From Swiss-Prot:
Putative thioesterase. Does not bind pectin, and has no pectinesterase activity. The gene is ybhC. Keywords: Aspartyl esterase, Cell outer membrane, Disulfide bond, Hydrolase, Lipoprotein, Membrane, Palmitate, Signal. It is a lipid-anchor. One of its GO terms (biological process) is cell wall modification. A lipid is attached at residue 22 (N-palmitoyl cysteine). It comes from Escherichia coli (strain K12). It holds the Pfam family Pectinesterase. Residues 23-42 are annotated as: Disordered. This is Putative acyl-CoA thioester hydrolase YbhC. It is an enzyme of class 3 (hydrolase). Its EC number is 3.1.2.-. A lipid is attached at residue 22 (S-diacylglycerol cysteine). GO terms for cellular component: cell outer membrane. Disulfide bonds join 185-197.
Amino acid sequence: MNTFSVSRLALALAFGVTLTACSSTPPDQRPSDQTAPGTSSRPILSAKEAQNFDAQHYFASLTPGAAAWNPSPITLPAQPDFVVGPAGTQGVTHTTIQAAVDAAIIKRTNKRQYIAVMPGEYQGTVYVPAAPGGITLYGTGEKPIDVKIGLSLDGGMSPADWRHDVNPRGKYMPGKPAWYMYDSCQSKRSDSIGVLCSAVFWSQNNGLQLQNLTIENTLGDSVDAGNHPAVALRTDGDQVQINNVNILGRQNTFFVTNSGVQNRLETNRQPRTLVTNSYIEGDVDIVSGRGAVVFDNTEFRVVNSRTQQEAYVFAPATLSNIYYGFLAVNSRFNAFGDGVAQLGRSLDVDANTNGQVVIRDSAINEGFNTAKPWADAVISNRPFAGNTGSVDDNDEIQRNLNDTNYNRMWEYNNRGVGSKVVAEAKK
């Protein structure tokens, strides 16, 4: 017997089985082939560099010596403080979410207030003001879609039209807790209300918790492919937790800001937000703003039914002297269309901005542009430039991850067709 021939046959058969197994494994389940330093169009972190980008770093305090925020899972009481649902239903304390929020704020307590929302559709805005204690708002249905908060608002609408849609029957009045929020928008003298006032759900509450519900700006595809900011959820507070929530819209679906009560971006605050087990949908600059936000086990879905030729997931407006902006880990990036969508771009609201984002340990599908995964900055039109650094004598990559001459948009250990690093032509 020719053992050599048998061995070769066995190896060939084994190799063939291996190839078959690999080819049948979906791309998003295969190991990542991203290697540092990547390219100037798609910079990739090394394992050593990636150690700097986890929740602990993003949730550090700007106050020297202060402990980092270490959020625990949201826990719900056996009996909430307030229940929102149909009139006459046993246990219901309020028929609108805003009325329940107002009642919780009026208590002026530093004790967390729990608001349970029964299944149903709740049309209209919800404003959660700053308060001594945190608010937990949660749906009691089996799924997030069972509780739906929605309204159609366009940042391009006039203040008069906005007042008509947002404040029917004196929902916001002087003396009510959220009046100052409403007044900061309704008193605008500009032609349009703007992105910051286009939010359906707006919170300035430190410690806000949202769970098991859906928030949607229903403007959707009723407008053209032009500039139509339409925020579903806006949060300004610190230590915000969002779990098992659908956030739906098109442009600027989820907007995080460090605005104070004057409703303006600030330079000395870094609000921190944790988003887990959630679903976020939109087309242009889906997640925007200024703050430290960690997304864990969250799906980002890009729809191109309105814009067709462009789509961006992240648009961070991180200050240049702040090292941490947005972090997505163990998440999924899905886009319709053939390589049109991009992972993000810096939202250059001023000369002190250099948006920061890291996508790591996540799956990116074929709907994303692999040749140019990151876009040029919005507003300033600053061309995207990733820092590939240099390699020292010990084969270690040397680069400043916060060099203001480069963008700060990074990836690490991602997989899927859309995660491919395309070689760049030598200049």
